[in-house]
Amino acid sequence: MTGIHQLLMTNFAGGIATGEGQLNASGGNETQTIGIYKYHVFTSSGDFTVTGGGNARVLAIGGGGGGGHNASGGGAAGEVDDFQELLVFDNSTTYKVSIGTGTTNNGSQTTISAGGTNLVVSLGGGRGGNFSTAGNNGGSGGGGGAGPSAHTSGSSGGSASGDNTNAGGTGGPNDSPFAGGGGGGATQVGQNFANGASHTADSEQIGGAGGEGIALTAIDTNLAFANFSSFTEANSGIVASGGGAGSNR
């Protein structure tokens, strides 16, 4: 099909949306045509085979980072590349689509590549910090863990890199219940721990909330769950939210 192709790629429903230009291509776990747009949705890694070169726009989301353990920070969301850039896909070329996944460490990245060269890289989110450990850097940054000492701020959140990413929140002091910071999300930083009136063992510390994600329909109004069998109502169309932090009391 010629026209505007869109590639949507994420580990809940990944894919490629083909863009302006006379592109002929196949691939994806699901394809849908909505108006002048043809959407290639990748829910798992696979090939995107171009038989007639042209342009496409890509929505790609990296895998989410894992939470830490023991008074830990929340895991962060992966980077969201969101259809803004028009990419050129070469004639008679097979592109490898690798869908990033959540892990117990940093999330793995989502990529499109051919001949060993990456056309798209969406970074995975950073892992949340353990007790007395900073959150990992990533797409969005992981939340910092609690500690290392009483009456002071805890460990810092990881920094963010790439499009639609935010840093992780700071963890609390080394006081019960040892609360961590939230992981960064696509549209909001991870929140710092919340504490009571004073930094004492009796303070009611609360782990920081994860940063807010982004609605797919805010990127493209066609990306409603009703239009794609790969989408589910359960995710409410919100992607790349950061994870909330835990505590240890």
Regions found by a protein language model. Give the residues of each.
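Periodic beta-strand elements of RCC1/NHL beta-propellers and select beta-solenoids
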Residues: 59-66, 118-124, 240-243
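Enriched but not universal
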Residues: 1-59, 83-89, 96, 116, ...
